[in-house]
Amino acid sequence: MKLELLFQNIANSFAFHNQIAVAVSGGVDSIVLLHLMTNWAKKNKLSLPIALTVNHGLRSESQKEADFIISYAKELGAKESFILNWEKQNIKGNIQLQARKARYKLLAEWCKNNNVKCLLVAHHKDDQAETFLLRLERGSGVDGLSSMDYKSFLNGIYIFRPLLNFSRSEIERYAKLHQLRWIEDRSNYDLKYRRTLYRNLLKASDNQDVLTERICLTALHMKRAAKALMHYTRLAFDDCVNVHDFGYIEIKLSEFYQLPEEIALRLLLYSIMAIASKHYKPRYNSLIVIFNKILQKGSNVNCTLSGCKIRKYGENILIIRESSKIQEITVHLPLNGSIEWDNRFSCTIFGDQECSVTIAPLKKTQKIPEFLKNYDYCSEVYYSLPTVQKDGKMLAYPDVNYNGKNTDDDKVRFIINSTIKQNLVSLISI
């Protein structure tokens, strides 16, 4: 069958990964993907895939469906199968969007924790067209209207979409030919969801396949335009932005004002996302208000967005982490290796004493030591920095200098390395 032959060619792009996981919702598309993947692995004498399913717990039958997936995945030849449960807390707004974010977070975290570098998901051509129409309705820009990538990168995990060039009808024909079983999600027919409306709209067209193909072609044009814009955004970062060792970003206004507005807006956007370490963009309506304020050359800029402070400081715009949004973490000393803090720093603590300590931001009630003041930064930068504390007592301030002194008695040494450049690379690479 055409789909099976084409899949074998596509699979060569991720064949070098020793272990591969497949996200299985139980729908026909993910069941077909798992079936294709297990057959391909057997034929090529490679490691069988791991099946992962997320139980969102949103419907009474959720657990029963998850159990079916685990059992059927084993029958189809999966090496192992796991249920990942979503621990829901105070869900607000769009439940489908929240569930999607949680699903990707759970899948990526499991892969990362189990040293699996490759995750397959079952998006197909019809998903592409429906997503385009949904985003068009919301007024999305070039990025939002771009086609989904065959390969993307999330939290250190490669995500592949091998079925992206196949239609739902092709996938269903394959499933029926191989007598596969799958779950029909009732929400796919619920008209309260906008995606269902657009799915039905496509079905009602005179030639669904042609219309879907043309929508996907437009999305591909948008993808090319987005890549061109990203190229020039990266060049603008080289000219306009300083990423500081102490965990903040400085944008030179003299250069910023010379940029085309679209490039300048993207530069501001990705700077905020890199400091906040978020892969989801802040709301456009909130971002554009701040952007327009920055463009007013005489205006005072002092705003917050997405867990960041955006403020004018001299001839620059500073993007600083908002201290109230930073989570403290507790670690036990002596620490073996480094530890990540706030997705902005890799922290190393040198000291022989055995005890539990807290890595927490410097509070405004605590003094700023002279060696930090000598850097002559905006005061809010200091309050976004990590410190080592025990029972409320300061054990060590941060430093980027291995030969410096950042504590009164030197029993504890605390060295920080900014990871913001890595955050930026993951955001603006194409």
Curated annotation (Swiss-Prot):
Record-listed E.C. numbers: 6.3.4.19
Keyword tRNA processing tagged: yes
UniProt KW keywords: ATP-binding, Cytoplasm, Ligase, Nucleotide-binding, tRNA processing
Pfam families: ATP_bind_3 (PF01171)
Gene Ontology molecular function, alphabetical: ATP binding; tRNA(Ile)-lysidine synthase activity
Record's catalysed reaction(s): cytidine(34) in tRNA(Ile2) + L-lysine + ATP = lysidine(34) in tRNA(Ile2) + AMP + diphosphate + H(+)
CDD domains in the cross-refs: TilS_N
Cellular component GO terms held in the UniProt record: cytoplasm
Spans through the membrane: none
GO terms under biological process: tRNA modification
Keyword ATP-binding: yes
Gene3D superfamilies cross-referenced by the UniProt entry: HUPs
Protein's cellular compartments: Cytoplasm
Binding-site residues, ATP: S25, G26, G27, V28, D29, S30
Family: Belongs to the tRNA(Ile)-lysidine synthase family.
Cited function: Ligates lysine onto the cytidine present at position 34 of the AUA codon-specific tRNA(Ile) that contains the anticodon CAU, in an ATP-dependent manner. Cytidine is converted to lysidine, thus changing the amino acid specificity of the tRNA from methionine to isoleucine.
Domain description: The N-terminal region contains the highly conserved SGGXDS motif, predicted to be a P-loop motif involved in ATP binding.
Cross-referenced NCBIfam families: lysidine_TilS_N
The protein's name: tRNA(Ile)-lysidine synthase
Gene: tilS
